[in-house]
Amino acid sequence: MYGKIIFVLLLSEIVSISALSTTEVAMHTSTSSSVTKSYISSQTNGETGQLVHRFTVPAPVVIILIILCVMAGIIGTILLISYSIRRLIKA
C-alpha cells in the first residue's frame, strides 16, 4: 500500500517538474526582449561602461542575517527531530 502511495507521489513530482520547466522556457522567451533593453551599456569616447541594471546589491548585514536564519532553521530542525525520537523511544 505504501509502495503505491510513494509511486504516485514520485509521479506527481515528475509531472510538476516538467510543467515547471516548460513554463520557465515560456517565461524566458517572453522576457528576453525586456531584459536586453534594460541592460544597455553606456559608451563614451569609444569606451564601454558598466552594464546598467535595476537590481541593487543587498547590504552585508542582510546577507549575514539570511545566513544566520538558515543556520538556525537547520539546527532547529535537527533538534526537533532528535527531541521527537527521544519522545518516541520513551513512549
From Swiss-Prot:
Topological domains, Extracellular: 20-59
What is any one of the record's Gene Ontology cellular component terms?
ankyrin-1 complex
Q: Which residues cross the membrane?
A: 60-81
Q: Where is this site: Not glycosylated?
A: S33, S34
Modification after translation is described as:
The N-terminal extracellular domain is heavily glycosylated on serine and threonine residues.
* Glycan attachment residues as annotated in the record: T36, S38
Query: Which keywords belong to this entry?
Result: Blood group antigen, Cell membrane, Glycoprotein, Membrane, Sialic acid, Signal, Transmembrane, Transmembrane helix
Membrane topology, from the record: Single-pass type I membrane protein
Signal peptide positions (record): 1-19
Tell me where in or outside the cell this protein is found. Answer: Cell membrane
Family annotation (Pfam families): Glycophorin_A
InterPro entries found in the cross-reference section: Glycophorin, Glycophorin_CS, GYPA_B
Give residue ranges on the Cytoplasmic side: 82-91
Subunit description = Component of the ankyrin-1 complex in the erythrocyte, composed of ANK1, RHCE, RHAG, SLC4A1, EPB42, GYPA, GYPB and AQP1. Interacts (via the N-terminal) with RHAG; this interaction bridges the (RHAG)2(RHCE) heterotrimer with the SLC4A1 Band 3 I dimer complexed with GYPA.
Q: Please give the family membership noted in the entry.
A: Belongs to the glycophorin-A family.
Function as written in the Swiss-Prot or TrEMBL entry: Component of the ankyrin-1 complex, a multiprotein complex involved in the stability and shape of the erythrocyte membrane.
Identify this protein by name: Glycophorin-B
Q: What species was this sequence derived from?
A: Homo sapiens
